[in-house]
Amino acid sequence: MSKFFIDRPIFAWVIALVIMLVGALSILKLPINQYPSIAPPAIAIAVTYPGASAQTVQDTVVQVIEQQLNGIDNLRYVSSESNSDGSMTITATFEQGTNPDTAQVQVQNKLNLATPLLPQEVQQQGIRVTKAVKNFLLVIGLVSEDGSMTKDDLANYIVSNMQDPISRTAGVGDFQVFGAQYAMRIWLDPAKLNKFQLTPVDVKTAVAAQNVQVSSGQLGGLPALPGTQLNATIIGKTRLQTAEQFESILLKVNKDGSQVRLGDVAQVGLGGENYAVSAQFNGKPASGLAVKLATGANALDTAKALRETIKGLEPFFPPGVKAVFPYDTTPVVTESISGVIHTLIEAVVLVFLVMYLFLQNFRATIITTMTVPVVLLGTFGILAAAGFSINTLTMFAMVLAIGLLVDDAIVVVENVERVMSEEGLPPKEATKRSMEQIQGALVGIALVLSAVLLPMAFFGGSTGVIYRQFSITIVSAMGLSVLVALIFTPALCATMLKPLKKGEHHTAKGGFFGWFNRNFDRSVNGYERSVGTILRNKVPFLLAYALIVVGMIWLFARIPTAFLPEEDQGVLFAQVQTPAGSSAERTQVVVDQMREYLLKDEADTVSSVFTVNGFNFAGRGQSSGMAFIMLKPWDERSKENSVFALAQRAQQHFFTFRDAMVFAFAPPAVLELGNATGFDVFLQDRGGVGHAKLMEARNQFLAKAAQSKILSAVRPNGLNDEPQYQLTIDDERASALGVTIADINNTLSIALGASYVNDFIDRGRVKKVYIQGEPSARMSPEDLQKWYVRNGAGEMVPFSSFAKGEWTYGSPKLSRYNGVEAMEILGAPAPGYSTGEAMAEVERIAGELPSGIGFSWTGMSYEEKLSGSQMPALFALSVLFVFLCLAALYESWSIPIAVVLVVPLGIIGALIATSLRGLSNDVYFLVGLLTTIGLAAKNAILIVEFAKELHEQGRSLYDAAIEACRMRLRPIIMTSLAFILGVVPLTIASGAGAGSQHAIGTGVIGGMISATVLAIFWVPLFFVAVSSLFGSKEPEKDVTPENPRYEAGQ
């Protein structure tokens, strides 16, 4: 094949140009992400039950729906949250690879079976089913710069004017508004109701009857009488639109003709649909809308589309109102991708310099460098065909591939120059002769390297997604590299290399290159003597190898484990929890103190603070608060002002708050898998011991975790039980007084809850009508005495006649996991420990809890547990594939052993480097480790292959091994050094994405240094030992035939 293109160099150029063109066009269309869709698909069900407690929601809604969800295909786990404000969310998480559209249809079908069994109030509110990830993509805020609009005004504007266009934006899965739109609020006065012998039920019935839209028909409608000349629509009664119209609703007509209207017993006016949440931006009145990404959607494209949507709405904002983005996860995506691109460019430059240092021929160096853009651009084309994206993982794989892909071109150029020097052939003929000698080896080495990485592509789960990104990218680059080495590089050699006379070399005799060559030759001589010594003293060095293997196993067991390294995402969360039963006013004081510290004491680090009262990731309620903290750009912050350093300082300050628990934490590396770094676990009531026992177990867990030196910031992702007033109805007494239970329940629901009646029209938009008791009539248990129920005789009976209450405790938020009641606990490893060690400690503590209490990992911890169980199998498969490929390549079962034995020599270096830098055994480390295995095997192949050929030509095992080492040392050092320096930019990276770059770069560099430095001494020993052990026949006398010297620049 190579001969064809050597004779037709323009053909080779055309192929190279087509590959680059296809790749360039693919880059323009490839989506850009920080990560691919690592999180498994999830479908969320959201329901509201107005006025219901968390327990009521769980019993009447959650369990009904959960029971119907059983039997859905590929369902991994189901979690739910029920809140005291009547809201509920069920999240069904599916196996990786499940089509989210299919999953949503299946969930919707199951939900249709459950809907008729749900309370009528829930069905009236509607049930939302969305494909959305768990975390927020960004928060869009509205802030009143001049204070002319209140938070309620801003929230109403968002819901009325912005919510719909935002929800229609491509990529938006779900959203949450921090505030509520206006509603017509009817505030009942119990004293006036009693005066007119009316009840809340009477008011609700009258409003429902008189605030209606009537379809009144037509005059002259078809079929019409002959000769009809008129057709007109009849406009009947319409929905009310103003507070005055509602005040005029007729409630009662007395016998004397006097009338009682709604305005006589209630205050009517526009107010918030609910008052649960309020927000501020840097201390100014604000409201916001948090957007969640649809499953599988592109974060950058969605964020860009949202910004365009807001830009189109801005001209219509009220005066003094400004749109802000107080929380945005996309800047880290562009920054991290940009950083890796810079790393890629730096790697190419460093590889070029190394090649020039060893080849010492500018034309030869240019030829090898020209293969880089062809292969890289071609790889982008393959990524587009495979449906991949440009993301951190594929770009890392590109960086790793650079050192691999130039290696093939180096082998071609180096061998052509050797043939010209030794045989005196012109470049074209020398290239033909050279390709006949090496094209088999090129294909063989590519197969071996592919064999190391291909098993990664077949693993499932979120870890499998990561592995596939690396595997497909590097293997694609390797395949293209071999094709380019067989097609394009020979054509370049035949046309660009200068001819050499027999015995002539390009290597310099004077200057820097002369000094380098002389010193390198001296090193080669010393290296030969060292190898000879090792081969004459096999046993001590084999024992030393055994010690290296033992050390590798010990380090593997000692190095901490993790899923992915932590990253500075440029954002920070702070979560506020005041004592159970605290008011919103009390919580706001703590929120203000937190904001003041961040904006003043951390002004060099913090860009903005968006605070929310009434909500945090643990739950909703007046005792909950939250802050979304945007940090300044990475280039404006030093290492001392990283998100982790800020979190530590902020946490120390928040410990001084006496009236609240405040936690500062950074988001995880993969935002789709949760809201916080560290671990995520559910304690489950698997034995049916009840809520109280589960709460006791949770408190025991938290107490033991607080004493552990391995864990830090361990906290419940829920709310503590708070005071609740248990109202008991004496049914017999109520019946004796002629009061029905239905009237009692309806009166309670309307007076103390917020009862939805129907809708009204406000400035052209449909909004809701709510009836509720006025605040002064529902502040304390004594206020219950102000409310009356009418009995069958028309008499007003006070609640005190048939009801009594007592204080108790109950949870404002209840969670379930896989069908049983559960409590979620979050935490992080203490400084110096990894998430793997923290998870092991959690399992130890959970094992000491009372019987009936189990635990389950979720989110990123679930994925980490899964990835840890896959690692041994992946490692074993990769080594097995290498062995089988080598066996096929050499047609021998014994020779591959000499190559496979080199694997621990690379692993030990990767482990030492990772350990010294305080990093963990995570997914990136494993990818780097497999790459190191492949490169170590490649270096061993270069020695073993030549030693085998020399031995077959009649050399002794000893002489064949030493001669092969001498011939291959220079190219091994050159290609290894090129690869190592190409990865150096990863290890010294800073800014966005630096954590993952360090994780992969450190292990690879450590592994390659040890694989190169140790392997060049041990590989000849392995070759001789294995060949001797398996009965390789020694020649009767040592023959020294003319062997082609495969020396770079010799």
UniProtKB/Swiss-Prot annotation:
GO terms for biological process: response to antibiotic. SUPFAM superfamilies: Multidrug efflux transporter AcrB pore domain, PN1, PN2, PC1 and PC2 subdomains, Multidrug efflux transporter AcrB TolC docking domain, DN and DC subdomains, Multidrug efflux transporter AcrB transmembrane domain. Induction: The ttgABC operon is repressed by toluene; this is mediated by TtgR. The ttgABC operon is induced in response to chloramphenicol and tetracycline. Keywords: Antibiotic resistance, Cell inner membrane, Cell membrane, Membrane, Transmembrane, Transmembrane helix, Transport. The chain crosses the membrane at residues 10-30, 339-359, 370-390, 393-413, 440-460, 472-492, 539-559, 871-891, 893-913, 923-943, 972-992, 1004-1024. It is a multi-pass membrane protein. The keyword Transport applies. Its main location: membrane. Belongs to the resistance-nodulation-cell division (RND) (TC 2.A.6) family. The inner membrane transporter component of a constitutive organic solvent efflux system. Involved in export of toluene, styrene, m-xylene, propylbenzene and ethylbenzene. Also exports AMP and the antibiotics carbenicillin, nalidixic acid, chloramphenicol and tetracycline. This is Toluene efflux pump membrane transporter TtgB. It comes from Pseudomonas putida (strain DOT-T1E). The gene is ttgB.
